[in-house]
Amino acid sequence: MPAIESGLLALILTGVLGYLLGSIPFGIVITRAFGLGDLRRIGSGNIGATNVLRTGNRPAALATLLLDSGKGAIAVLIARAAVGEDAAQLAAFTSFLGHLYPVWLGFRGGKGVATFLGTLIALAWPVGLACCLTWLATAAVSRISSLSALMAAASGVVWMLLLGQGQMAALGLVLAVLIFIRHHENIRRIANGTEPRIGKKASQDQSAEQ
């Protein structure tokens, strides 16, 4: 963790801003804008880009991915520019929490992977890029989005230490633990060999998850 040098009020304000940005449910907004219905009633019911992809609409899934990662990155960049590095890490954490527990959806949100990657890219782009490449490499081999997410999250702290960003390690560990908790059902299905693979549409995924 960086040294806490900013004032309490500044940290509170950037933390709240990060949470509010993170809590914007772009997956729901995008699917409705594309006329795809309520994302919470599609596939797994998750509000993230992977579930949007289950509609078969790749542009909508890409837009969701970019916006979910972008909101985390923007929260970090605003906090860093306005306050400092301690506020930037706080905003990364609160924007991530906002995606997981959005006030607008009764605190029932997504799993946070895109927002996690967005915050890392903004905090230290080499670490963020390394985690993105870890996700892509795992996805190319396994074709399982959740496994790719878990590998990216687990590798985050390792990349932070290897790339000279040890001051981010505590944050990276907390975010990784939360991602694993949010993926507990996916972990069970991975162990059972029943986790759906990337590219399957909603009807296929629902039958696989029943």
Curated annotation (Swiss-Prot):
Quaternary assembly: Probably interacts with PlsX.
Protein EC: 2.3.1.275
Location in the cell: Cell inner membrane
Listed GO CC annotations: plasma membrane
UniProt KW Membrane keyword: yes
Pfam families per record: G3P_acyltransf (PF02660)
Family membership noted in the UniProt record: Belongs to the PlsY family.
Protein name as annotated: Glycerol-3-phosphate acyltransferase
Function according to Swiss-Prot or TrEMBL: Catalyzes the transfer of an acyl group from acyl-phosphate (acyl-PO(4)) to glycerol-3-phosphate (G3P) to form lysophosphatidic acid (LPA). This enzyme utilizes acyl-phosphate as fatty acyl donor, but not acyl-CoA or acyl-ACP.
UniProt cross-references to PANTHER family, sorted A to Z: GLYCEROL-3-PHOSPHATE ACYLTRANSFERASE-RELATED (PTHR30309:SF0), INNER MEMBRANE PROTEIN YGIH (PTHR30309)
Record's catalysed reaction(s): an acyl phosphate + sn-glycerol 3-phosphate = a 1-acyl-sn-glycero-3-phosphate + phosphate
GO biological process: phospholipid biosynthetic process
InterPro entries: G3P_acylTferase_PlsY
Membrane-spanning ranges: 10-30, 59-79, 87-107, 116-136, 161-181
Membrane disposition: Multi-pass membrane protein
UniProt superkingdom: Bacteria
Pathway as given in its UniProt record: Lipid metabolism; phospholipid metabolism
Keywords: Cell inner membrane, Cell membrane, Lipid biosynthesis, Lipid metabolism, Membrane, Phospholipid biosynthesis, Phospholipid metabolism, Transferase, Transmembrane, Transmembrane helix
Enzyme category, top tier: transferase
GO MF, one example: acyl-phosphate glycerol-3-phosphate acyltransferase activity
SMART domains (alphabetical): G3P_acyltransf
